[in-house]
Amino acid sequence: PEKEIEFKYPLFDFPYLNSIIEEHNLHRVRLMNLKSKTCYSYHKDQGKRFHIPIITNENCFFVVDEEIKRFPADGNYYILDTDKKHTAINASWYDRIHLIGNL
């Protein structure tokens, strides 16, 4: 049966994004902007993160257990295991934006 979702505020009515959230059973979904020339601390979280790169370039990357990983904005999604030590680095002159959700 088709499930209809009603939103109290039209701001949250994004059929395409909502279909991705539902299809992958994501929670705590957010748009994350990593400012140019910044990085996060090297840390661990719990669980896996679903990433859809929206705006990025070759100077934006992750370091996961001392291995560099790049997620291009090619329309695909990527899974990051945040149980491992990791950081995100933006060494470019432009902000990086990802849609991120917890799995």
PLM segments and residue spans:
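Signature of the catalytic double-stranded beta-helix
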Residues: 1-34
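Residues that flank catalytic or metal-binding motifs in active/ligand-binding sites
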Residues: 27, 46-48, 95
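Residues in well-ordered beta-strands of folded domains
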Residues: 30-32, 53, 63, 89, ...
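Short, conserved beta-strand element in jelly-roll/cupin
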Residues: 33, 44-60
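A short hydrophobic beta-strand segment most commonly corresponding to one strand
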Residues: 50-53, 77-79, 93-103
